[in-house]
Amino acid sequence: MKIPLGILLSENQADKENILKHLEENSYIITVGDRTTEKMIDFDLIPSLQIVDGIEKREKREPPKLVNTTEITVDNPPAEITSQSIDVIKKAFSMESPVRILVTGEEDLLVLPVCIHAPENSVVMYGQPNEGLVIVKITSEIRNKVQSLLDLME
């Protein structure tokens, strides 16, 4: 997605202090992407839901380390959003966190169904390649915008 869904913090602004300004005390943190997930874990901002694929900028990598995480795997081919992926995302929201969805394929577009199905107090974070970190506070306005994007993709 070329246009960020939320606030874009440039690489040098994406520190813990700036990120905390966009979180509330009880925010349900969701990360999409290995680097974003790793960064939040390093900042001790443990994502309730993490969606990773073990790849960063087309290079294979180890998924971020975190103990006591429930892990679910799902197949999601590049440039697609499968119904299986949507079902797994919905299921993850009903599980005790932290939950990690390990994607075989590509996780990038899963930001969209996450924004639709995330709980009210959610904040979704994902990387904008070569630009920085996108922070999306889930609101009905965001849900409607994302639904319009999904409708265009069908």
From Swiss-Prot:
The keyword Nucleotide-binding applies. GO terms for biological process: coenzyme A biosynthetic process. Pathway: Cofactor biosynthesis; coenzyme A biosynthesis. Coiled coil: none annotated. InterPro entries: GTP-dep_dephospho-CoA_kin (IPR007164). GO terms for molecular function: GTP binding; kinase activity. Its EC number is 2.7.1.237. Signal peptide: none annotated. Keywords: Coenzyme A biosynthesis, GTP-binding, Kinase, Nucleotide-binding, Transferase. The keyword Ribosomal protein does not apply. GTP binds at D34, D53, E107. Pfam families: DUF359. It catalyses: 3'-dephospho-CoA + GTP = GDP + CoA + H(+). It is an enzyme of class 2 (transferase). It comes from the Archaea. Catalyzes the GTP-dependent phosphorylation of the 3'-hydroxyl group of dephosphocoenzyme A to form coenzyme A (CoA). Belongs to the GTP-dependent DPCK family. This is GTP-dependent dephospho-CoA kinase. It comes from Nitrosopumilus maritimus (strain SCM1).
